[in-house]
Design a protein with these regions (language model features):
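Short, low-complexity, intrinsically disordered N-terminal peptides in bacterial proteins
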Residues: 1-7, 142-145
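Feature captures the catalytic cores and cofactor-binding loops of soluble hydro-lyases/lyases
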Residues: 4-12, 21-132
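Internal active-site segments that recognize and position negatively charged phosphoryl groups
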Residues: 17
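Phosphate/diphosphate-binding glycine-rich loops and adjacent basic-rich segments that engage nucleotide
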Residues: 133-145
Length: 145
């Protein structure tokens, strides 16, 4: 197994690891994710029926209403939140949801902003391990050698 690393901007501190789940389009957690199961339920989303639980969730940006923060926090409360969230564009709704989940439920889901040129390489990894502290996030990519 080979390991590489990518640096990113930390938006929410924490550490998490999981297989990457790359979403081709932004996802609204309010109405697009079942917080009880972690299932993507948006019937128009290309990754409908994917499970976010325990995954390194990669999405270009969030989409939707401010209620998405509550839906994301609820998924963490019920134990089906992602292990980490990687974005290309800043999204305050995603950040607030992860911060609320950390404060209320002790969920340490890091959220990081990655550079678009790193996106494909991250998505192709077998597993991603994210550690976010301060403003710096380090993402270790594990791939089969």
């Amino acid at each position: 197994m080979s390991v590489a690393a990518v640096e990113a901007l930390a938006l929410v501190p924490g550490a998490g690891a999981g297989a990457p789940l790359r979403l081709d389009e932004p996802l609204s957690f309010w109405g697009g994710l079942d917080p009880a199961s972690g299932l993507v339920t948006d019937r128009w989303h290309p990754q409908r029926n994917a499970i976010v639980a325990g995954r390194a969730l990669m999405m270009p940006a969030g989409r939707g209403s401010s209620s998405g923060s509550a839906a994301l926090a609820e998924a963490f409360r019920l134990g089906v939140g992602p292990a980490a969230i990687l974005l290309i564009e800043r999204d305050p709704i995603v950040v607030v949801g992860a911060l609320v989940a950390a404060a209320l439920y002790g969920a340490a889901c890091p959220v990081a902003l990655v550079a678009a040129p790193d996106w494909e390489r991250l998505a192709a990894a077998r597993r991603l391990a994210i550690e976010a502290k301060g403003t710096r996030a380090m993402i270790r990519l594990e791939r089969a050698s």
